[in-house]
Amino acid sequence: MGHYFINLFTYTIIAFIFSAVLCKFLMKKMINYKFGYDLHKKEKIKVPEMGGLAVLFSNALFIPFVNPIFVLPIITAGIIGIVDDIAKLSPKEKLILLFISGLIIGILFYNNSYVNLIEILIIALGIMISSNLTNMLAGFNGLEIGMGVIASISLALVLFLDNYTTGFLSALIFSASYLGLLIFNKYPAKVFPGDVGTLPIGAFLAVLAVVYKEYIPFLVIMMPYVIDASLKYLSAGVMSRDEHKPTTLKEDGKLYYIGGYLSLPRLILKYKPMREPHLVTVLWIIGIFFGIVGILISLIA
């Protein structure tokens, strides 16, 4: 048991440090190659993008020490994210690529006796849907990465309580890698994650949920994403991420909702305008709440 906790501590700490150091390096390189502008600031701030590359490399390097097959959804979703960041895939193209990659991953997991035939399709659908959900709840400094860390830690604790050691350790390394990115992505953001950073979150968590049959806790943990996507769909139909216009920043430094499509952040701002870091904190608290509920459901079950 002592040896297990030493490995646990070692892998997670090194993954965190590696991700943070690599992210710092990439920020300097990407600022002149791939960058965007922070839309919720009074000044026009130039911010490097694709910081998720640091997390992709960190997870690809350290998760195989636990179980190599668990890195597959991260790498495939990450590659699709890179293509999307550079070439701007349409929503339909992104869904198709994620579904096809999900089928391939499902077959590989089936060949290694992790899932049955029906679960191959569940993995494909899970990767397609979940990756898009974690990609859509975004647009504010630290939001998507912070929510991803909360969701992955929540699922890690569910797996720990159910004695799934390999899944728990994989999810913990995954969380540590994203924490390394969050240091630079939190308000005020010094780097944006890009789709290479957001798509793998949903893909990895969906695969863990299917492999370890943690369907209900996973669905509960993902509820903030589901609510956000439902609000967007009901208010505006299917949109590409580029169509997600920023909220209004007024002279008092607060963000306001003044019409247009609804989302979870906009629903909050509709009733109480607030500053960007405060809004993100509220959303993190919502994520933590559903994470705790998911953990409690696992304990009861």
UniProtKB/Swiss-Prot annotation:
Chief place where the protein resides: membrane
CDD domains the UniProt entry points to: GT_GPT_archaea
BP GO terms, sorted: cell wall macromolecule biosynthetic process; cell wall organization
Organism: Methanocaldococcus jannaschii (strain ATCC 43067 / DSM 2661 / JAL-1 / JCM 10045 / NBRC 100440)
Enzyme Commission identifier(s): 2.-.-.-
Family: Belongs to the glycosyltransferase 4 family.
Tagged with keyword Cytoplasm: no
Pfam families to which the protein is assigned, alphabetical: Glycos_transf_4
GO MF annotation list: glycosyltransferase activity; phosphotransferase activity, for other substituted phosphate groups
Enzyme type, top EC level: transferase
Acyltransferase among keywords: no
GO cellular component, one term: plasma membrane
InterPro entries per the UniProt record, alphabetical: Glycosyl_transferase_4
Keywords: Cell membrane, Glycosyltransferase, Membrane, Transferase, Transmembrane, Transmembrane helix
Sequence intervals crossing the membrane: 2-22, 62-82, 95-115, 117-137, 140-160, 164-184, 191-211, 280-300
Record localization: Cell membrane
Record's protein name: Putative glycosyltransferase MJ1113
Top-level taxon in the UniProt lineage: Archaea
UniProt topology in membrane: Multi-pass membrane protein
Matches recorded under PANTHER family: PHOSPHO-N-ACETYLMURAMOYL-PENTAPEPTIDE-TRANSFERASE, UNDECAPRENYL-PHOSPHATE ALPHA-N-ACETYLGLUCOSAMINYL 1-PHOSPHATE TRANSFERASE
